[in-house]
């Protein structure tokens, strides 16, 4: 086989992506993260952020940043060397107390946390039972473990139970892995059923609640709380601090034994530098804001209802979602880009989501709503979507 240059191998791949309307580009932001922003030189209303409560630019978080004088910025080392600061420790304790778990453990990103849990806990011969629409980091974490990955159709509880029954017959340890709120669809996992199945078949449950924390449940405790459920000793929760919290980082919460096992054995935790202590301090402030954000959660609900009512009146095809994530299904990637670009020219930033992020022929506009959006923002979006329907008719709308 001839040796290739990087250019010769990948230039055709990139060209193919461009031709198929699958090429991705990074928007350049030149303003704070708010409902109204400057992106790629345009002044726009942002409907693509995960800043669900409008905390990313909150004065309390900014004030926390200004208290850095008693800290170094960098942590200087991994947690197990000299990088574990008191601010990290306090944040972990406060997150655990908030969720009613014995312990919590910080990670720099949700991706690292999802890799760590599955790589560490699951061994050869075990089964990971995963929803087919789980986030990419959950899929990667399963693939990088030694366990066998068994994916079940989206939200199909009968299919999940059949796999659990087979695993029980073969005496296999199972980990059920699911998003709480699915990031590209906005629908919720039926956690009452999933938790009951986990208990019946003695499986462990790993819940990625990145998009549920802050927005759902009492005090924003997430999808479990939304369904009036509590974690048990075999429940593992992953949450992120960069979405509704408006900060950065992630955590895993669960039992004492779980967290100590991750500290001792999780490679993505052990072999990386700890997040800056100031990030943990800001996240502690964000946690207090989230706990007190009942008014923002109510405003977010009103915004979701406002958008859904208007979109349904227009006859747009919405994915069944009651969360802040409201996908408008278009089907073809080219159509999704066409609509997205037209909206940008009207001062509205709505991202087109295309394969491979979502299945083939399910390209969509992913509208994400925030408590920071006003009724006027949403009306402007609905009017522009109506214009897109006239300008670019689609069989999916």
From Swiss-Prot:
Pfam families: Aminotran_1_2 (PF00155). One of its GO terms (molecular function) is 8-amino-7-oxononanoate synthase activity. Catalyzes the decarboxylative condensation of pimeloyl-[acyl-carrier protein] and L-alanine to produce 8-amino-7-oxononanoate (AON), [acyl-carrier protein], and carbon dioxide. Its EC number is 2.3.1.47. This is 8-amino-7-oxononanoate synthase. Keywords: Biotin biosynthesis, Pyridoxal phosphate, Transferase. Belongs to the class-II pyridoxal-phosphate-dependent aminotransferase family. BioF subfamily.
């Amino acid at each position: 086989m001839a040796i290739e240059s990087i250019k010769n191998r990948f230039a055709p791949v990139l060209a193919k992506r461009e031709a198929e309307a699958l090429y991705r580009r990074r928007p350049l932001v030149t303003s704070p993260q708010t409902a109204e922003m400057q992106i790629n030189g345009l002044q726009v209303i942002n409907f693509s952020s995960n800043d669900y409560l409008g905390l990313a630019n909150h004065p309390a978080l900014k004030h926390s940043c200004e208290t850095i004088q008693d800290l170094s910025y960098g942590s200087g080392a991994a947690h197990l060397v000299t990088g574990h600061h008191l601010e990290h420790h306090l944040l972990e304790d406060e997150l655990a107390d908030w969720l009613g778990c014995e312990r919590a453990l910080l990670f720099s990103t949700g991706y690292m946390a999802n890799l760590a849990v599955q790589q560490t806990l699951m061994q050869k011969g075990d089964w990971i039972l995963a929803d087919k629409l789980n986030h990419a980091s959950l899929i990667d974490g399963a693939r990088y473990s030694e366990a066998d990955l068994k994916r079940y159709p989206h939200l199909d509880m009968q299919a999940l139970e059949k796999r659990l029954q087979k695993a029980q017959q073969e005496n296999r340890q199972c980990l059920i892995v699911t998003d709480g709120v699915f990031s590209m669809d906005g629908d919720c996992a039926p956690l009452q059923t999933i938790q009951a199945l986990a208990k019946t078949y003695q499986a462990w449950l790993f819940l990625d609640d990145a998009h549920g924390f802050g927005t759902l449940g009492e005090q924003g405790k997430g999808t479990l709380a939304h369904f009036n459920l509590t974690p048990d000793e075999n429940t593992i929760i992953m949450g992120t601090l960069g979405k509704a919290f408006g900060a950065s980082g992630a955590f895993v919460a669960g039992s004492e034994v779980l967290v100590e096992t991750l500290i001792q054995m999780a490679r993505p935790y052990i072999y990386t530098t700890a997040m800056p202590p100031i990030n943990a301090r800001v996240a502690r402030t964000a946690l207090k804001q989230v706990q007190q954000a009942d008014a923002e959660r109510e405003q977010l609900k009103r915004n979701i209802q406002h958008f859904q009512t208007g979109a349904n009146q227009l006859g747009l095809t919405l994915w069944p979602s009651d969360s802040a994530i409201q996908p408008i299904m278009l089907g073809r990637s080219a159509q999704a880009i066409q609509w997205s670009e037209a909206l940008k020219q009207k001062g509205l930033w709505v991202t087109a989501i295309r394969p491979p992020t979502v299945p083939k022929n399910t390209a969509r506009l992913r509208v994400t709503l925030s408590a920071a959006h006003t009724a006027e923002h949403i009306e402007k979006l609905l009017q522009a979507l109506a214009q897109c329907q006239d300008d670019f008719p689609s069989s999916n709308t």
